[in-house]
From Swiss-Prot:
Protein known as: Uncharacterized protein near lysin gene
Coiled coil residues, start to end: none
Organism from which the protein derives: Lactococcus phage phivML3 (Lactococcus bacteriophage phi-vML3)
SUPFAM superfamilies: Ribonuclease H-like (SSF53098)
GO molecular function: nucleic acid binding
Length: 152
């Protein structure tokens, strides 16, 4: 059984004026290809940057995890490049964060499903989301934010 793709997308998290914001951008649409989904994510991120005036912010981007499917991995890398090109200049630079680094910092381990659960647990402990929240993209974004804040 394959997991549903309806929850595919990306999470975001930032602090502004002492307030923590977390959310996610749902990008999956069976009628759209990877490029079109990336375009939707870019536009949503641009809207967030504009709405919250985040142009002075430095963006952390999780390093894409390449799978076994070569064609898919190349598309993922190309879409990531498109994303970076589109947001470059809209924020004050960006840094790639390896999944292994932020997971290790938060003591998250195990296989993918277990890591998702542990990531979600950390977000739920903030009280920002309901206890039945299943949005691991948002959870990962929050945990990447707190990892980056720890780095200084």
């Amino acid at each position: 059984e394959f997991p549903s793709k309806k929850d595919e997308g990306t999470g975001y998290a930032f602090r502004k004026d002492g307030q923590l914001y977390v959310g996610s951008i749902k990008a999956y649409n069976a009628k759209k290809n990877a490029w079109e989904r990336t375009f939707d994510i870019v536009n949503a991120i641009k809207d967030i940057i504009d709405e919250f005036d985040l142009k002075d912010y430095h963006m952390a981007i999780e390093t894409p995890i390449m799978g076994r499917n070569r064609k898919h991995s190349i598309t993922l890398a190309n879409c990531n490049g498109y994303f970076i090109g589109a947001i470059d200049g809209l924020v004050n630079g960006y840094t790639f964060i390896d999944n292994s680094k932020w997971c290790s910092y938060h003591l998250i381990s195990g296989k993918r499903e277990q890591r998702k659960e542990e990531s979600l647990e950390l977000l739920k402990q903030t009280g920002l989301v309901p206890l039945d929240c299943k949005d691991d993209n948002m959870a990962d974004a929050y945990n990447i934010l707190t990892y980056c804040e720890h780095l200084g």
